[in-house]
């Protein structure tokens, strides 16, 4: 029996099984040791991060972060209830269309907290008009975009003659630039500039209006950047500062030209910060006329707007009659509008007669 057992012990099958078993056992041990070595180390408890007492309840919010709308963006000054700056992009396609300001109303911006917003009542009886920084006329392509320009976050108290006159002519000039340039960017805003007093000191003082004490600016500014079709780099830039007071038609835009750096010092703003100013950027008035329309041209423009809004033939005829009394000859554009409107009234009158007969 011993011999039989010895034979079995020395048999290849037994030895092979032993070797395989031993190898498997050894492998299992090695694997176990490896798994043991790979165990996640026990982490020491992390002490809670100490908060700086300065930050415990947050820093004051200025409310001047940029707010974006369909075709303009702005930074709002909640203390003065006016914008600090308003930027817009103009192109030929945006300044034409069927959008009409008669469907728009001035109202508080729903994005501005009520406690920081101006209201229409602030302007009522104040002697100041509600002056657009991004004008409604730059958004003929979209009724919604035009309506957003009537938010009071885009409005400053403005002298009536300035708003309807020189500032309006500046806005018209910006729109006219889209006929000569592919892209036009305009940044507009209010300024409260210091004045010298008898004691030799300079002071910043400004009127406030209404229960919300909306700040009346002493000056207004525009920065105009233009780019030609097919170009990646803008061609020219111009900066202008005008007083918030009447300016007659005998004045032209170059009279109010300032260095961009000077305006940046006045406003505390850096305009177009991603613009490379070293790449051959030219002064706007060197590459374009900077010419604002003259009085007779302006009256033709106003007459054309009145023709479009005329509600009967009598009012339509009166518009042309008043122009002739002032010695102004209607241009082709105005006469075309007049004829189109007159035909509309004639057609409506004929339809009304037919309905009465029926």
Swiss-Prot record:
It comes from the Eukaryota. The active site is at 132 (proton acceptor). It is an enzyme of class 3 (hydrolase). Its EC number is 3.1.30.-. GO terms for biological process: apoptotic DNA fragmentation. Its cofactor is a divalent metal cation. Pfam families: Endonuclease_NS, Exog_C. InterPro entries: DNA/RNA_non-sp_Endonuclease_sf, Endo_G_ENPP1-like_dom, ENPP1-3/EXOG-like_nuc-like, Exog_C, His-Me_finger_sf, Non-specific_endonuclease. One of its GO terms (molecular function) is single-stranded DNA endodeoxyribonuclease activity. Keywords: Endonuclease, Hydrolase, Membrane, Metal-binding, Mitochondrion, Mitochondrion inner membrane, Nuclease, Transit peptide. SUPFAM superfamilies: His-Me finger endonucleases. Transmembrane segments: none annotated. A divalent metal cation binds at residue 163. One of its GO terms (cellular component) is nucleus. It is found in: Mitochondrion inner membrane. The active site contains 1 hydrated divalent metal cation that has only 1 direct interaction with the protein; all other interactions are via water molecules. Homodimer. Endo/exonuclease with nicking activity towards supercoiled DNA, a preference for single-stranded DNA and 5'-3' exonuclease activity. Belongs to the DNA/RNA non-specific endonuclease family. This is Nuclease EXOG, mitochondrial. It comes from Xenopus laevis (African clawed frog).
């Amino acid at each position: 029996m011993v011999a039989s057992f010895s034979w079995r012990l020395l048999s290849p099958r037994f030895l092979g099984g032993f070797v395989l078993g031993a190898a498997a056992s050894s492998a299992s041990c090695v694997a176990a040791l490896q798994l043991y070595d790979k165990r996640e180390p026990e982490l020491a408890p992390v002490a809670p991060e100490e908060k700086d007492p300065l930050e415990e309840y947050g820093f004051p919010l200025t409310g001047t972060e940029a707010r974006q709308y369909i075709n303009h963006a702005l930074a709002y000054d909640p203390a003065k209830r006016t914008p600090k700056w308003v930027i817009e992009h103009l192109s030929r396609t945006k300044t034409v269309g069927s959008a009409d300001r008669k469907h728009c109303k001035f109202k508080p911006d729903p994005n501005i907290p009520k406690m920081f917003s101006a209201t229409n009542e602030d302007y009522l009886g104040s002697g100041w008009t509600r002056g657009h920084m991004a004008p409604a006329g730059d958004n003929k392509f979209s009724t919604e975009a035009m309506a957003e320009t009537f938010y009071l976050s885009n409005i400053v108290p403005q002298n009536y003659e300035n708003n309807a006159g020189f500032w309006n002519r500046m806005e018209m000039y910006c729109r006219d630039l889209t006929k000569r340039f592919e892209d036009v960017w305009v940044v507009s805003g209010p300024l409260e500039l210091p004045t010298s007093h008898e004691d030799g000191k300079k002071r910043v003082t400004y009127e406030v209006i209404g229960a919300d004490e909306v700040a009346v600016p002493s000056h207004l500014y525009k920065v105009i950047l233009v780019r030609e079709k097919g170009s990646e780099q803008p061609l020219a830039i111009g900066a202008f500062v005008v007083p918030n007071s009447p300016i007659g038609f005998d004045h032209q835009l170059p009279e109010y030209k300032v260095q961009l750096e000077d305006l940046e010092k006045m406003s505390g703003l850096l305009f177009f910060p991603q613009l490379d100013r070293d790449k051959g950027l030219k002064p706007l008035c060197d590459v374009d006329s900077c010419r604002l329309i003259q009085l007779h041209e302006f009256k033709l423009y106003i007459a054309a707007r009145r023709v479009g809004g005329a509600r009967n033939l009598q009012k339509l005829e009166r518009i042309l009659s008043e122009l002739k009394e002032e010695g102004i000859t209607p241009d082709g554009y105005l006469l075309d509008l007049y004829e189109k409107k007159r035909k509309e009234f004639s057609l409506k009158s004929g339809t009304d007669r037919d309905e009465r007969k029926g």
